[in-house]
Amino acid sequence: MPDVVVAIAPFTQPTQTSELLSGFIPEGQKPIPAKSLAALDSLFRTKLHTDKHTYVFLSESDIRGPLVKDERGRRNALVTWAERARRAGADMIVVPHIVMLQERVGGEAGAVSAAAVNEDFYLIDARKPEALLQRSHFAEEQQSLVNDLTQIGSFFRRGGKWVSALELAGEGMDKAVEEIGL
């Protein structure tokens, strides 16, 4: 992605299928507090390599409004995000969706309930014709080492402790930054 301006949308939680770029909304989805969404936005900004691309960070007011309709008159999330990027003067846009964010119950040494996260990062080419170029998906619930020995690498990478939902989401952000080339 040389010499392109990349818009970064704030984290949103899709609650209707028309808002999704892919995937589905889980049954019994719980709303994610605005404070948590803001914390995710702040963390994601720190993960981006500002020497690689020119970034334009969109605000909540930049993305407010109904979905744009496509040529057939249907509400279309892809066209909507591309339009928001173009309005910001960007060639591409990264759209982070957080479908589920479950905070750990307990402390770092022991948890009654583990942190869990389900997030997607979409790279959309906003130039006509609009196109979804890439998706990075991260869905994980931390497991104890006793329950899942296959996760020993993650266990040691996390310092042998129970992580918060924000820390777990940060792992998904790292994955997206690498996969998408941000």
Q: Which role fits each region the language model picked out?
A:
Residues 21-23, 109-112:
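Short, glycine/charged-enriched secondary-structure capping and boundary segments
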Residues 12-97, 126, 130-134, 166, ...:
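N-terminal segment of the mature soluble domain
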Residues 1-16, 84-88, 111-114, 118, ...:
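C-terminal/domain-edge helix-coil "capping" segments
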Residues 99-101, 122:
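Short glycine-rich beta-strand segments
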